[in-house]
């Protein structure tokens, strides 16, 4: 089980990223617009840099929903490989069967 503080920190990063997503996308679209002068684009880059660091989506860590484990998390289920194997073995996950050949 991961530390509760790390899980909470990641949750706050998710919330902050969602709340400032529209502002960040608008600034980036203006920055990449070639019709705007270089000075204006540079000032927009500075505005983007002033946004909170934790509002960037790259700061969010994919964690297991059950244990909070940061590594080995499947995108499809949002669960770590260990817990996924355990749940599949018990037959809890619908549509997934253990392969044998």
Swiss-Prot record:
Domain of life the protein comes from: Bacteria
InterPro entries: Ribosomal_uS14, Ribosomal_uS14_bac/plastid, Ribosomal_uS14_CS
Molecular functions (GO terms): rRNA binding; structural constituent of ribosome
Keywords from the named record: Ribonucleoprotein, Ribosomal protein, RNA-binding, rRNA-binding
Region (Disordered): 1-21
BP terms from Gene Ontology: translation
Matches recorded under SUPFAM superfamilies: Glucocorticoid receptor-like (DNA-binding domain)
Listed Basic residues bias regions: 11-21
CC per GO annotation: cytoplasm; small ribosomal subunit
UniProt function note: Binds 16S rRNA, required for the assembly of 30S particles and may also be responsible for determining the conformation of the 16S rRNA at the A site.
Similarity section: Belongs to the universal ribosomal protein uS14 family.
SUBUNIT field: Part of the 30S ribosomal subunit. Contacts proteins S3 and S10.
Protein name: Small ribosomal subunit protein uS14
Native source species: Rickettsia canadensis (strain McKiel)
């Amino acid at each position: 089980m991961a530390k509760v503080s790390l899980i909470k920190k990641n949750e706050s990063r998710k919330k902050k990223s969602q709340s400032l997503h529209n502002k960040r996308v608008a600034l980036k679209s203006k920055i990449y617009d070639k019709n705007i002068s270089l000075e204006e684009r540079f000032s927009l880059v500075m505005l983007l840099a002033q946004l909170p660091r934790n509002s960037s989506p790259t700061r969010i860590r994919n964690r297991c929903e059950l244990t909070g484990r940061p590594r080995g998390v499947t995108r499809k289920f949002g669960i770590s490989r260990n817990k996924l194997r355990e749940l599949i073995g018990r037959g809890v996950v619908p549509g997934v069967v253990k392969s044998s050949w």
